[in-house]
């Protein structure tokens, strides 16, 4: 069904140098696709055979509901924004070009979207393809779902979602009115964390499907496998965006606290992985203390409060520990242990 406003669902696929995997991704998407769905592929200036693979796939699979856009390399955030600019569906979803969806992906999701009841439909992912949802008679993976209703400025139903902190963009289908004019932060990584939590605050009704409809392929190109210096800055940027939001929306403070704490812990972890210790810069130190000031500390563990209250001490202790461990390793190495 195609209505006057466009398709029911737009699927945006950003891609960059994924020639080896994109054919499998497209094949998984087209297992159960209907004419209610448009596919928007945005090639972020690939230098390998990605474009050739895409064209070869569609030369063998006739499909009138595909838009292919190729632009110079600008990063995944801008690439997704280009996809948003071309999307006409009432709902919008995202699939990464190296991942797979289960064969019942559209069979499950489209009936939910046709109801036009939900602001977000979310589901789970798996990193083990053997755990991907399969609709088999008598299978143990029966479809399980529940609604999250938000009313009268009561955001408590969002607490489990924010506590889990699973902001994977690919596991969410958004009503286009929820996204509105929001766009992905350009030239930032971890854009899912910067974007997704704020969409939930605009919702009235969310459908949570517990099953694993999406296979996330871990590969050497993923950001979790390739930490760069600016990654922690992006996480602290997300935290800053949230505490600034809370200062204007006090009624969302308790739920937002969970996201703020998640950002602090994730940013801290990235710094240690990249730098060897919690090497907060001055901007981060300022962000941490501003964030703590707007948190609902009743739901935060005391040891985390202390680390946020005294980030200079947290940094110094971790630096001393790092230097001692490094010296010991060097000593053992020289002595041939």
Stretch-by-stretch model annotation:
Residues 27-36:
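Short, acidic, metal-binding catalytic loop of nucleotide-sugar glycosyltransferases
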Residues 71-87, 108:
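Glycine-rich, basic loop-to-helix element that forms the pyrophosphate-binding segment
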Residues 28, 43-54, 73:
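A conserved acidic beta->alpha catalytic loop
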Residues 97-207, 217, 221-230:
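Donor-binding/catalytic cores of nucleotide-activated saccharide
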Residues 21-23, 48-57, 100, 104:
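Acidic helix N-cap motif at the loop->helix transition within catalytic regions
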Residues 92:
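Short aromatic/hydrophobic "clamp" motif used to bind/position activated sugar donors
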Residues 36-45, 67-72, 97:
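Short beta-strand/loop segment that forms part of the nucleotide-sugar
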Residues 275-337:
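Membrane-interface aromatic/basic loop that binds lipid-linked glycans or pyrophosphate carriers
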């Amino acid at each position: 069904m195609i209505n006057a406003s466009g398709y029911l669902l737009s699927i945006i696929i950003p891609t960059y140098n994924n020639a080896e995997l994109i054919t499998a991704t497209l094949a998984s998407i087209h297992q159960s696709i209907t004419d209610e769905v448009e596919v928007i592929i945005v090639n972020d200036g690939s230098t390998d055979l990605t474009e050739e693979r895409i064209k070869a796939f569609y030369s063998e699979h006739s499909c009138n509901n595909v838009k292919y856009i190729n632009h110079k390399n600008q990063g995944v955030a801008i690439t997704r924004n280009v996809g948003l600019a071309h999307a006409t569906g009432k709902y919008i979803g995202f699939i990464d070009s190296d991942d797979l969806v289960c064969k019942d992906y559209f069979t499950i999701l489209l009936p939910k979207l046709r109801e036009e009841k939900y602001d977000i439909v979310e589901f789970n992912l798996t990193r083990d393809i053997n755990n991907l949802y399969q609709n088999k008679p008598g299978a143990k993976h029966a479809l399980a779902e529940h609604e999250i209703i938000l009313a009268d400025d009561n955001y408590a139903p969002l607490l489990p979602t924010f506590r889990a902190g699973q902001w994977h963009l690919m596991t969410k289908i958004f009503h286009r009115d929820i996204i509105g004019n929001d766009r992905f932060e350009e030239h930032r990584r971890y854009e899912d964390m910067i974007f997704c939590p704020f969409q939930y605050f605009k919702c009235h009704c969310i459908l949570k499907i517990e099953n694993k409809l999406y296979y996330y392929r871990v590969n050497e190109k993923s950001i979790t496998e390739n930490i760069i210096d600016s990654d922690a800055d992006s996480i602290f940027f997300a935290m800053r965006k949230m505490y600034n939001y809370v200062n204007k929306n006090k009624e969302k403070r308790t739920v937002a606290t969970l996201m703020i704490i998640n950002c602090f812990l994730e940013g801290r972890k990235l710094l240690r992985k990249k730098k060897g210790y919690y090497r907060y810069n001055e901007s981060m130190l300022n962000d941490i203390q501003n964030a703590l000031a707007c948190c609902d500390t009743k739901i935060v563990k005391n040891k985390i409060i202390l680390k946020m209250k005294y980030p200079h001490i947290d940094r110094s202790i971790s630096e001393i520990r790092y230097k001692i461990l490094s010296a010991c390793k060097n000593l053992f190495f020289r002595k041939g242990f």
